[in-house]
Amino acid sequence: MIRFVQIHGLQLVRHNSTISTISGKIQNDIRLMIDQKTPRAFLKQNSNSTKELVKILDVVDKPDEIKPIKRLLMKKFKQNYSPFINKLRDASENPTKLHLTYIKQIGQEYRVLFNKYIDEIISNNEIDTIDKKNCIYEMINLQNELYPTIGEKYGWFLTDKIHKWFWENIDKNESFTHYYFLIQNNVNLSSSYHILQFQKRLLKGSQLEFELASFQLFLHKPEYEHIFRRKFIILNSFDSIRSFVNLLIQKNDLRFLRMYFNSMLDSMKRPSFKTNPDTVEFDSRLNLIYFNISLLNYLSKIEDIKMFSSTLRILANETSKIQTNELNKDNKIRLSNISNLLLSPLSSSITLLRNKGMYDEAFDLLSLMRKTPMVHNSVFKNFLIGHLISCLRSFNDPKLSLQYVTSAYRRKRVALFLNQLGLWGWVYHGKSYTLSNQELDTEYQKIKNTLPRSMVSIQYPPLPVLTELYITVLNTFSKTMDKENFKVFLLDLYQRYKKTILPMRSHNLYFQQNTGILNAFLKHVRYSINDHLLSLTILKDFYNESDSHRFKPTDGTSPFSIVVYQNEKLSNRDISKVLELMDSLEIPLDFKFCVAMVYHYHSRNNIPEALVWYKKILDSKFNVEHMGLIKLITENGWEYPDHFDMKLLENLDEQKQSSTEEEDFLISNTKEDLETEAPTEATTDSEMIIKEFQAMISNTNHVLKKPLLD
């Protein structure tokens, strides 16, 4: 029998176990059969009565038929029920299935038998794939119908072998229906690698598939919310729920976030099927930290700095209680992973504080994190140092920034490196000057202990930190020097940078090169010196060097975009040279370069070629919010991109992009600058959520019955 279920406008097939249709008369026949004989008659060796009864039971497949029969047999045989079932099993043509169907109590024996039976189906070469799937579905549905209390309270756990068979034999297009069937039948969705593969596939699929995997499908209408409330935390692990929360925040879909956060808290209180008794306390502490990190993701998204700081203090307090020397290797790795998860929300919030000029608050957050065990993670430590140097940019004091970099990377070779780059001579001595080893050592000893040991790294400064230092130095000198002297300074610094960095082979900087520092040079050539042809000269000079192919643009802005964007000094021949260079380096076209090309040809009244470049933007599915480009699109009657926000047209007349805004378009959102994009407007009542989260935060410690690892 097949029943259809309507959810969210979608018709889904529900498989009920059935191979033959059995009349309700069977119950009466069985009743008469067992009433006419004593239990002993069925318990005798090779009992004909037992064989006759088994013939009937073997063809009864419908759960609604089985339930009253089972109750009838249990009432008849009472304490002899288990021996009676053993006799039935011995006489049955399908003994394992009969045993699973009529077993008295669910326990370890049942779970072993169930998985063994499914394994037998999978291994049976006489059954084709479709029939195997139907047989497995039949058993999954049967156990859920026969033992609903167990399924609703704990969920059913299938082995990874079973989920692997599904993964390898169910068509990708059937993933939605398969996953929905598992939800209907209370199958745990986080217990093994291959069921998580189904989950990942759906999360990366259509919106409907995403909503099924995340259970959001059941929240659109009140009549289906009970499915979410009843099944969500039973079938999904804490880690899965956490991943759903973070994905929804990333997608800026905040409509049902309160329910998801509440589910995270409820899940923390439930014992995990993967719980190791030796690490239960650490696991509880870790889950509380994970919860707070997800909360930080949300608070950074809605830019609530006050609540973000409060939550971060809770997280710092929790992590500071963990004694890392008591952890085994695996748990140290897990703790290290927390550092990586925290990078995104912390970076967003510190960047927001910097952009708002709230540097004291930014320094407070950095100071707070310095006291946690996460500073033992080199990536996290470099992250903190990078943002510290970024915040120091507000003081317009290159000496202070250089002092902190030298102290943070407390090795004499780092001071030698900065001396080779020319930064030490220009910053401390105001001229192109390379100090002798003795002079350098004297100055180095005075500043090397500026930062505490907990903030000291043994590496070279990573490129984001080095980029921040260059940005600070270039920005300050551009304001304190006249244009000609600044040009001399910049070219000297550029030549030293090129000669020092490009030949490097021996350490980590060689493997992490990007164009952040080159971008900073080119920005100042164009917007501080206003020598637009010089920017092209530097670009070609840099990429003519033998090792320059290692320097790839990052996700933000390429140096090619900086050179070409609204550069009226460039001829079509110059543009061709730039394109040839990009092609030889296999550098892909980004949105900003395409916009630059549209501007270039449009300013020369070559509308057809401008349209060609605009179509590249359309073909690449870039998100178009650049008001200058939108104005050109509107004036020329070009088609708007798919999913274009037509509300942007309302502000078109008010938009007059200044040169500063054009600079920001080119330089912002680069990884080298450690910037992140501002979030779009939240789609829910943030104040209401925050109030609930405040209550959550105050109650999270109650999840833990006692302080852990103090």
UniProtKB/Swiss-Prot annotation:
Keywords per UniProt: Membrane, Mitochondrion, Mitochondrion inner membrane, Transit peptide, Translation regulation
Domain of life the protein comes from: Eukaryota
GO cellular component, one term: mitochondrial inner membrane
Region (Disordered): 657-683
Subcellular location: Mitochondrion inner membrane
GO aspect biological process, one term: regulation of translation
Targeting signal (transit peptide) range: 1-15
Membrane topology of this protein: Peripheral membrane protein
Protein task: Translation factor specific for subunit 6 of the mitochondrial ATPase. Required for assembly of the CF(0) component of the ATPase.
Family: Belongs to the ATP22 family.
Protein name: Mitochondrial translation factor ATP22
Organism: Vanderwaltozyma polyspora (strain ATCC 22028 / DSM 70294 / BCRC 21397 / CBS 2163 / NBRC 10782 / NRRL Y-8283 / UCD 57-17) (Kluyveromyces polysporus)
